[in-house]
């Protein structure tokens, strides 16, 4: 499995405040890694390091040459008075042609939003549009910062199905960042629990039972960690509704 980004013993401090200490992990082709941590534990800073937006104080970082990265931000603010359709928003991406937009939206089952006003999108629709935009440069690595924020449970299930499909069909490496314990994707390859340093790592089942994880989130909260497993034989749309049987779910993989 090809390494896309490898971090070894990363440390970041802002002034005298240590934000990250001794962080090591590897993002690989076809590999899904979830970073789970409470607010204020350094996860945004770590995302910036992965995206090369800040340089750590202590570092060994190896990247695949000419690595293409697609980024889905935690949120995006758009002036409500700005007349901006989904198509025009996606064309703001450098080098994008009009003909690139339809296929990107279709890949995430959002082609019907092509001419929709950005300001009128639901939380789930906005996430799908941001994901489609991240796919425009044919990335090798997807970085998703709180991708389920503002999305209901059915929408989260649909998003997890899509991410799993993308990594299998296109071989993307995926870094997902979250502070939400309510629903975690079971098919991730590795979960890291972060609180300025990596407290524990492993599968969701292993991490959820780790003493450091329980100490960080509390017994009550950590015991509520829900792991989503794909057991259905149908597909959800952007709103979480079951799609008609006439639309095949041939890309689906079952446990």
UniProtKB/Swiss-Prot annotation:
Topology with respect to the bilayer: Peripheral membrane protein
EC annotation from Swiss-Prot or TrEMBL: 7.2.2.20
SUPFAM superfamilies assigned: P-loop containing nucleoside triphosphate hydrolases
Catalytic activity: Zn(2+)(out) + ATP(in) + H2O(in) = Zn(2+)(in) + ADP(in) + phosphate(in) + H(+)(in)
EC primary class: translocase
Positions of the ABC transporter domain: 5-220
Pfam entry (one): ABC_tran
One term of GO molecular function: ABC-type zinc transporter activity
GO annotation terms (biological process): response to zinc ion
Subcellular location: Cell inner membrane
Keywords associated with the record: ATP-binding, Cell inner membrane, Cell membrane, Ion transport, Membrane, Nucleotide-binding, Translocase, Transport, Zinc, Zinc transport
One Gene Ontology CC term in the entry: plasma membrane
PANTHER family (UniProt xref): METAL TRANSPORT SYSTEM ATP-BINDING PROTEIN TM_0124-RELATED, ZINC IMPORT ATP-BINDING PROTEIN ZNUC
Family per similarity comment: Belongs to the ABC transporter superfamily. Zinc importer (TC 3.A.1.15.5) family.
Biological role: Part of the ABC transporter complex ZnuABC involved in zinc import. Responsible for energy coupling to the transport system.
Protein name: Zinc import ATP-binding protein ZnuC
Higher taxonomy: Bacteria, Pseudomonadati, Pseudomonadota, Gammaproteobacteria, Enterobacterales
